[in-house]
Structures are given as structure tokens and as C-alpha cells.
Amino acid sequence: MKDLLNLLKNQGQVEEFDAIRIGLASPEMIRSWSFGEVKKPETINYRTFKPERDGLFCAKIFGPVKDYECLCGKYKRLKHRGVICEKCGVEVALAKVRRERMAHIELASPVAHIWFLKSLPSRIGLLMDMTLRDIERVLYFESYVVIDPGMTTLEKGQLLNDEQYFEALEEFGDDFDARMGAEAVRELLHAIDLEHEIGRLREEIPQTNSETKIKKLSKRLKLMEAFQGSGNLPEWMVLTVLPVLPPDLRPLVPLDGGRFATSDLNDLYRRVINRNNRLKRLLDLSAPDIIVRNEKRMLQEAVDALLDNGRRGRAITGSNKRPLKSLADMIKGKQGRFRQNLLGKRVDYSGRSVITVGPTLRLHQCGLPKKMALELFKPFIFGKLEMRGLATTIKAAKKMVERELPEVWDVLAEVIREHPVLLNRAPTLHRLGIQAFEPVLIEGKAIQLHPLVCAAYNADFDGDQMAVHVPLTLEAQLEARALMMSTNNILSPANGEPIIVPSQDVVLGLYYMTREAINAKGEGRVFADLQEVDRVFRAGEAALHAKVKVRINETVNDRDGGSVTNTRIVDTTVGRALLYQVVPKGLSYDVVNLPMKKKAISKLINQCYRVVGLKETVIFADQLMYTGFAYSTISGVSIGVNDFVIPDEKAQIIGAATDEVKEIESQYASGLVTQGEKYNKVIDLWSKANDEVSKAMMANLSKEKVIDRHGVEVDQESFNSMYMMADSGARGSAAQIRQLAGMRGLMAKPDGSIIETPITANFREGLSVLQYFISTHGARKGLADTALKTANSGYLTRRLVDVAQDLVVTEVDCGTEHGLLMTPHIEGGDVVEPLGERVLGRVIARDVFKPGTEEIIVPAGTLVDEKWVEFIELNSIDEVIVRSPISCETRYGICAKCYGRDLARGHQVNIGEAVGVIAAQSIGEPGTQLTMRTFHIGGAASRTSAADSVQVKNGGTVRLHNLKHVERVDGHLVAVSRSGELAIADDYGRERERYKLPYGAVISVKEGDKVDAGAIVAKWDPHTHPIVTEMKGTVTYVGMEEGITIKRQTDELTGMTNIEVLDAKDRPAAGKDIRPAVKMVDDNGKDLLLPGTDVIAQYFLPANALVGVADGAKIAIGDVIARIPQETSKTRDITGGLPRVADLFEARRPKEASILAEVSGTIAFGKETKGKRRLVITPNDGSDPYEELIPKWRHLNVFEGEQVNRGEVISDGPSDPHDILRLLGVSALAKYIVNEIQDVYRLQGVKINDKHIETILRQMLRKVEIAESGDSSFIKGDQMELTHVLVENERLGAEDKFVSKFTRVLLGITKASLSTESFISAASFQETTRVLTEAAVTGKRDYLRGLKENVVVGRLIPAGTGLAYHSERKRRRDADKPLRVSASEVEAALTEALNSSGN
């Protein structure tokens, strides 16, 4: 027995390891793995089913088929363990060894490994400096390659075809060596002297000038250094020995009827063995060259197919025309080893069933069917039955359970007590898709789910199914209870708002309960306390909606933990007083003294959580739910056709619109308007009519007439069922009601254009056949869109998770002072997101001063909570620098201070939180709600007149931001910069709105002026671009000759003459190179200089400019010299929704991106080329001018002689994130990407915290490009990990050497995932072959830092509770203790870590 125990112990021994290295296998290594050579292609004997000797399933090589029994049956039983049978040669062992023991095949001729040959860039090609095409010609026996030229005129590596080879033979005889096939390639690889080559390349690179050549050489150099550093030899890329997979991993299973099911690999191996044996025989017989060659080529092809079928030529197919699955196919793709078996395993102790609603459950409970519980908890029940002595053996216990004896149910109830189970609903889009509950046994077969967690699961009860999992170990139960219990997940990790929010019936009930009605029974009564209200209501003396006065005692908690009790009389309704009974102590009565709509309820729960804490909130949420259900039942709200009240005005509105349409039609018929104008007008008309109808309808629905208690008829908010549902937020919206009771409105064709005739009917009236047909388009497109959207959104989430999976909080504070400047987010002049909301839950990076003083009011390092937000708003601070994941300086991972608040818990984030995955889930989860389509700006939207003025919405004080301006004689300011902005601040100094001011805008207010709402503070002409003078003087024309460079036009209406500059291509030959300009001179005729420079003040005029001043005219500061007409902006498609988010995260360069100034300086135009303009920027510091060629059709925002700053827009268009990063830096990039992504989500009403987007951005900015290598081993132009470069630079700095210089690089998420340090993570993401090839050649080490790598190797992940385990293991290793870590030690370490992080 003791022997057996020892044996079992030995089986499970696993060496502890800290990294995994991948490399090339040498022939010796392959032979050392092997237990024998496979010589025959036979598999098993088809009569006896015994494996053939020396075949692919040979028991002598791979081990016995049955446990502890040799093949011939001479030795059986455990006592013969390790004996080798002398008859059949089989070792007596466990049959499991057939999964582990490998064999090999000695190849008669070397074979190139297809991965290193064909996976681009071809590694063999790079090393030998030959093209892939040439190598293939050698490998597949089409040409000879010279290996050793000897004393001849041939060169090493030269290709010879048959004729050339025979000519050379005749000429030189045996003086040279030229061969073909893989052995030739192997010889050449073997002959490479890595050290010598590396030295040669390092010398050659600095001496070459051509960019492409340097690129090629540095690629070779990198590969050679990789080979040198990894200990791989180049010739190992050519195989001489082929390893054979253990037979149980490629099984052969007999089916009934004498047929066999087999793995494809067996076919591929058989093919290789057959060809190899045939080749050996041919070589022994010394057959003619041509036959041997053919056989070698076939062997090469067979091995290619085994390693990666279909990579070269046509894939080898089986009997059923299906390509065979090769070794490479086994590991890649969704069904491959990585994604199917290592990252996604099926688990034991789980079940699934349909869900149904459990309105009587508490929040931490779920209803589990008895039958399911019995099956899931079987082992626990067996154990308990045996422990109780109710069953003598496990077998007896099993029988008892099968018979379902009464005592079994008692035991089950006991086993289940306090044993949480996990409920999961697919698709699990975020971490709230799996939560823990305490099971309650129920009859029936459906799982009961608490209604409030439906929002988190996105579940409904129309047939959804959910899976149940049982956490078995004590640690698992502990984590389920402490971390995953539904009561611990009240806030959403995406935005920190409650996710346990009542919806639908509950909202309706609470809304109905808190509405007020005029002249209800009991109106005007006064009650002494809440209990009295309750009694009177139950007695039926007062109606639920009656307006009454009640004396209340309330205890209000303030933010500092104190509380104030006071008594007052409030005007309220009976229902609200009843609702206040379930509100926890500490909240004021005002929270319920209003109609409880969905938003109000959400706010109430949030406030409750912040003020009175988790436990009270959970109890309160449950109470709210019970109350809501009760009162929505009492209310009897239901919908009948009569609730859809159609407004009386509808017929008249539609009649009027129809008449107008007829009028437009007749105009079109008589040719007064074009087809396009007619279409636009008609569509405008109908959308206006639709709005009017819906306005009338809502006005009609929302009010009803009642008699008050003085007998007067008054209006009150309606109790129409449909209106109440929409108003409370329970179900439906104004848009849907409009279709039911108003008119359906305009419909779109499948191509997105709008059909001119709207559907004037609504659903109550019913649609005609034509109307129904028109409306099917939209419905169909909607369904098709949804199907596509789900797949796209899932893929986006997968890429996000992959790029961010290894980002974990690893330390408390990285000590950086850097951060992002936060300002309110402004859109179209309005503040969409105030500063307070953006900094909530962030840590302040630098002290915040009281505006205008030196007094610090918020010290650096403060975690901003709701209390601080109010404080910041009160002190009218409008910009704060906060810590951000992007600027965090932690090496591996991120620090808690830079991340700030853990949104799902409401306090500073704990060490070990997997913030990367949370960010990915928060961004990916709402993906299915985003739209898929690109919006065409056309129809109503494109004709909105271009903005030509700034009109203030709120009154306040004017503030001008980085605005360069000149003051005109009349005191108005004229903007002479492009980046100026005008903001309006309120009395507290908080910014309320902000507007961009274009060049040439005339501003009628000054800094600090007070303005009223509605005032127009700036004006400009949107259709022309003015050239404004910045000084006074006299105008002189330069190079303006009529008929050659300019033409005069007279305006018919005004009779004024304008001078227009001719386009260069319309000028006669004499005027081609003349550049017309307007020069400023003083009264003596001397040239004036631009203020502050020594540049002559002359304004060059581009083509089509209109000059408005006469030669010799006197002008003042701020006058307009000329105007350049601007073609109205072309309508372009705006990519919205999911594709836009994907584009931003993939950092794609947009088409026709905006052009930014590369340097700060003065603009000039150089010589034009065909179709392009040459823009020259001369820097002010006297360095070399920067030139750029810009296509002529691009509209430029700048003109000659103007000053621009680095990164300013020269030509409009969508921004390119790479340009922003290069020219304006990381924080400008962060601001751009965060705002752009938020705009997309905001449009759908989805809230995501900025820090999640920043977290993903941090991962996209991991790489840097080396600009100067200094004394480091980096090569210029290399892309390296930022942390890696910083570590190296620290080392160089310490040794007083030159450090390397680098620029930051932005990678798209797919590229970033593939270029991680961990090859396991990258290989399991995409492009498995390429990643593994590269990793093997460079001998990469994976240090298992991320989550994915650890899941793949089957460890705890280094996040959450697993982080404690890993750090404890590391500490042990450093202390050289024995390496088994027990649960209790981890527990102790975890407690210590939690205490130190201040929890």
C-alpha cells in the first residue's frame, strides 16, 4: 500500500518554473526525447486490434496499451512495474505514458522546416540573403546552388540551372561544389559565421545612405543577433530528424462495423514514412539521379504537409476532399489548442436551465431546482450521509440518493446552507455576467433569478438560459462570497453608477405611488407622523395620490460621518410618505418628495450607497423592489387601444403639409426649382409636420382636465397608462408613442436615402398595404444590422482584452508628478461634461490654487470624491491636472494613485486589481448598443447654414483664450490667430460655454466684459477667408498687372469694382511666375516691417483672391486687404458608432487626414510642381526650413507670411492620431482619443469613465522608436518596449555613457497585442504561426507576467487574490525556502497587503 502511495505521489510532481523559453530543437535534442524510431507506416493489426511493431502505434516504443500489462500478456499486475518483457519488448507501465512518449523518424535526406521558410519574412531567406523564390528553386530541385566555389569564377550562393551546371562541370571539373535540395541549404546555413557577419553588418550600416538598404541590413543584423543570443544554430531550421507525436494524442478508434476513425496526423505521418522508406531504398540501390531527386522532393512536400498543410501549394486532402489537419492547424484558430483547450475549458459541477423571475427572493439569493441541486452537490451529500452514519459506504450513499429518500433532502438542505453558487449568463460581456448567490431550494425545473440583477446580466425571461457552477474549495467559496456576491456588486465598474436599479414594473409602481392628483380623497389633511398616514391609508380614508401635510422626524447624515436630526412639516402626498418608511435612516425626506422616475430612483440608490453604506443599500434596494411590485399591482395600469389618443389637430396639420407639397410639385413642374431642391424641401416639410403632430399628441396625452375641490376645472398631469409608462421611464419613449398615436413619419430606403412620401398613419389607425411595404425596409435592415453588430462588437472586445490583459495594479504610488490637464468637455459651445464629473475618483497631480491667489485649496495626492467635487465647483476652478494611467511610471503594471478610485467599490483601487481587463470589458460591453452605419451628411443636416457668429447662451463674464488679435479703430478686436477661443464664465467663475474663433472674426467684447444671454459677441463671414493687416500704412500693388495676373470685375448690383487674382494656369505665359502681392509702405514710401520681425510686410495673394483696397489707399489696423473665397466644405461621410471606435483603437490613419505644421515658423510657398503646392515653413530659430508638398485640391487655412505653431492645422480634415502624438505629445493625443470615443458612446447614452479609455491608450503607447542609439545595443529605427529602453538608459546613465534617444509610437490594439513581450499571449491571440516562428528563432523567454500566459500554463493569475500567491512564491524563491505555498500563508500575506494599502 505504501508503495502505491509513493507511486501516486511521484506521478504528480511538477517542477516550479518562472519562465518558459521557446527555441529550435537540434537533431540531438529530438533524439533525446524519443523512445525509438518509427520504421514502418503500419498502425494496428486490423484483426487483433494490437499495435504493429515499429509502426506508428508500436507498444515497444510508446508503452503498453493497458495499465501494467505487456502486449503478449506475459507480465500483468503492478508487481512487475518497470519490467521489459523479453518476448514483445514492452515495458510494464501505466497506459498513460502513451500520451507522453515521443518517437522519431530518421530522414534519409534533410528537409527544410516550412515555418522558417514560408512564414514571412522568410527566416532562412534573410539569413542566407537570398530571395524566397530562389531558395524554393533549390529546395524543390529546380536549380543548383554553389556551396564552395573553390578556385573558380563562380560565387558562393550563386544559382545554376542544369545547363549552366554541366557547363561549369566541363569547365572546372571537381574544383567547385554545387548541390541542390535541402542538404545544400543546410550546408550554406552551417557555413554562416554569425560573429563575423554581425561585425560586417555593424560596420556596413553607418556607411550606407539608402533608407531601404539600411532597413534590409538592420533586419538581417537583428536576426543574426537573435540567433547568436539564443544559442540556436541556423542549420537547425533544416530538419534531419522528425519527431513523432505520442500515439494517444493522435488516436485511432475502432468504430462498430469494422471501420476506424483516425486523426489526420496518422495519414500525414504514414505518407512521410512511406516516402522516407522508399527514398532509403532508392539510395541503397543507387538509383538514377532524377528518380532520387523526385523522391526527395516528394519527401519535402510530405513533411511540409505534416507541419503546416496548405502553406505551400495545394493542401493534401483526405478521402472526402477535406484538407487534412496538420500540426499547425491543431494549435491555431478558435478550435485550436490555445483557444479551445487552454483558455476555454469546460468545468465539472455545473448545470444549466431556463431562468424565471423570483420576485420574493432577497438580493443575495437565487432559486435552485431541487433536482439540479441534488446532482450538483452529490459528493457533498455522499460525504455527509457517510459521516452521519446513514450510509455505510459511498456506494450505499449513491443508492440512497438515486432513490431520493427523505433523509437525502434534509442532508441536501444542510449541505447547501451558506454554500454560494455562481450564476453565469452567456454572453459574459463584463465581470458582472458571473455573480455568486446563495441557493434556495425550489420545486420545478427553472432557476429563479432576482429581478434587480437582470440589468447586470442583460437577462430577460423570454426563454433565456443560465449556467450554475459550484465553487468547491474553501478558498473558492470565500472569494465567491467576499468578491462575487451580488450584494457586493451594486456599482457598475464602467462608470461607478448603481447597476442594481429597478426597471419596468418596479419603476412604474414607485412612480404611480409618488404621483400627486388634484382633489383626491383626503386632500388637505394634516398627519402627526408616518404611522398615522399608514393607518389612514389602510383604512381607505385617504387616497394614495392625495396632497397632504405630514410631520416627519428625519436623521440626515452629512459627508463627514456626523448626523443631524430634525422635525418638520412637509407638503407631500400619502404615497410618498408611505415610501419614506422603507428609506434607510440618514437620508432626508426630500429624496422621495418628488415623482419617482427612473433617473430619480437611480440617483436615490447612488446617494444611499454613498451616505449610509453597502449593507443598508442592499436592504433598501430589496424593499424598493417589493414596494414597487406591490403598488404596480394595485395601480392596475394596463394599455388599451383607447389610451392611444390621436390629437384632433393631426388631420389639419397633415392637410396643410399636403397642400404645400402640391405647391412645390407645381413649382418643380414649371421649372422654378430643381429636382434636388424639391426633394429637400419636401422632406423638410414632412419632418416639420411630424414634429408638430407629435407635439400636439404629447400635449394632449400629458394633461387632463379635472375639477379641484373648489369646483374649478384645472389641468393636471395625466394618468393615461401609456403616458405614465413613458414618463416614468418604465417602458416606451416619446418616439414610440408618436408611432402609436401620432404619425409614423418618413422612412428610409435600404441605401439610406429618405423616401419623399411619409407614412401619415399611425399604428392605431393601421397602415395601408403600401405604407406597410415601405416600412419593411427599415425593420429588415435593423435585424441584419443587429446580427452583424454582435459579431463586430465581440471581436472589438476580444482585441481590447488582449491588449490590456497584463495591466494590473502593482504598487500604491509611482511618485510621478505628471498627469493630464482636465477641463470641462465642450461641444458646440455647451459644456457636455463639467469638470467635477471628469475629475471625480481621480488623484490630483499638482496642488490646485484658489483662482488669482497663491492659496492651495486642493493639495496634490488628494483622491477627489463627491465632497471634493462640490468644493472644486464652488471655488470655480476650471482646470486641474490629475494623475492618469497614461502618465504612470510603474514598470510592470500601474500604480493605485494614477488609477484613482475603483469605480465598482467607491474607494482607492486595491493592489492586484486587473484594471486592464475591466477597462476592456467596460468599453466592449456596450458595443452592441452602438450603431453600425456611417452617417451620410445630406438632406436636412447638410443645409444648416454655416456658423457665422457666436451667440451667448448663458450670461456671464467673457474670457479670451490664446487669442492673437489686433484692435480696430472702432475698438472692436479682430482675431489674427486660428486657435483662439472665447469662453463665458458664470458668477462663480465656472466656465459654462466655449467657442472657437476663426481667423478674421470681429469680436465686439473684451476680456472681462459682462454679457447677457443671447448677446452676439463675435461675427465673421463663413464663405471667405480674409487677410487682415496688423498695422496702418499705405497700400502698394506688387506684380499686379491687369490681364496678366489679375482681372477687374464690376458687380452688377452695386456697381463696385473688384480685382480678382487669376489662377496660374489661366494666365498668359508672361504672368506664370509673377506672384501678385499687396505691400505696406509708410508715408515716405519706405517698406514697413511686420511687428516684431524683420520681414517686409507684404501679403502674397493666392489664386481667386478678391482685393478690396485700391493702390495707394491708406488703411488702418485690422482692415481687410483681400478675401479668399472658400468653397463650401464638401459633404463627407461621418463614420459613427462601432466602426469609428474600432478605427480609433486601431489607430488607423484616416483618408485625407488634416495636415499639421511640423515646425513653428513662418509660412511661404515655394515652386509649384504638377498638381502639388510646395509649402515651406521657415523656423524662427534659424534652423533648416521644412518643406512639404500638398495636393492643389486641398484647401489651405494659411497664407504667405503667416506665423504658425508646431501642430497647428494647415489643411482641414479628420485628425491623424499619429500626427497628434508626434507634434503635440501624449497628453494632446489622450485628450483627442478620449473625447472622440466618448462622443460616440455619448450619442447612444452610454456612460464610460475616461480612465478606461486611458488605460487602453497606455497599452497602445508601450513602444518607442529609437532615434539615436547612443552607447546602447539598440539599432536606430528599432521599435522597443518603453520600459526596456528606460531600464537600459538608467544602466548607461549610471556608467556615464551616452543614453539612447527615442520617440513614442502609437500602435493599434491588434498590433500592440501581437507585439507584447509574452509570446504565449500573442500566439493565443492571432497569427499563431508567425508569432511562434519569430519567438522560436529569437529564443524568446516568456516571464508569465500577464494573466493570459498564466491561464495557459494552468496557474493562478497574478491579479486579485492570485497576486498575493505570486508575490509570496517570489518571496520564498528569493529566500530559498521550500516552494509549496499553502492557502493559509496566502491568506496571511493577503491580509497584510490589504492592511498596508489602507483599507
Curated annotation (Swiss-Prot):
It catalyses: RNA(n) + a ribonucleoside 5'-triphosphate = RNA(n+1) + diphosphate. Zn(2+) 1 binds at C70, C72, C85, C88. One of its GO terms (molecular function) is zinc ion binding. Its EC number is 2.7.7.6. One of its GO terms (biological process) is DNA-templated transcription. Binds 1 Mg(2+) ion per subunit. Pfam families: RNA_pol_Rpb1_1, RNA_pol_Rpb1_2, RNA_pol_Rpb1_3, RNA_pol_Rpb1_4, RNA_pol_Rpb1_5. Mg(2+) binds at D460, D462, D464. Zn(2+) 2 binds at C814, C888, C895, C898. One of its GO terms (cellular component) is DNA-directed RNA polymerase complex. It comes from the Bacteria. The keyword Repressor does not apply. The keyword Transferase applies. SUPFAM superfamilies: beta and beta-prime subunits of DNA dependent RNA-polymerase (SSF64484). Keywords: DNA-directed RNA polymerase, Magnesium, Metal-binding, Nucleotidyltransferase, Transcription, Transferase, Zinc. Its cofactor is Mg(2+); Zn(2+). The RNAP catalytic core consists of 2 alpha, 1 beta, 1 beta' and 1 omega subunit. When a sigma factor is associated with the core the holoenzyme is formed, which can initiate transcription. DNA-dependent RNA polymerase catalyzes the transcription of DNA into RNA using the four ribonucleoside triphosphates as substrates. Belongs to the RNA polymerase beta' chain family. This is DNA-directed RNA polymerase subunit beta'. It comes from Pseudomonas fluorescens (strain SBW25). The lineage of its organism: Bacteria, Pseudomonadati, Pseudomonadota, Gammaproteobacteria, Pseudomonadales.
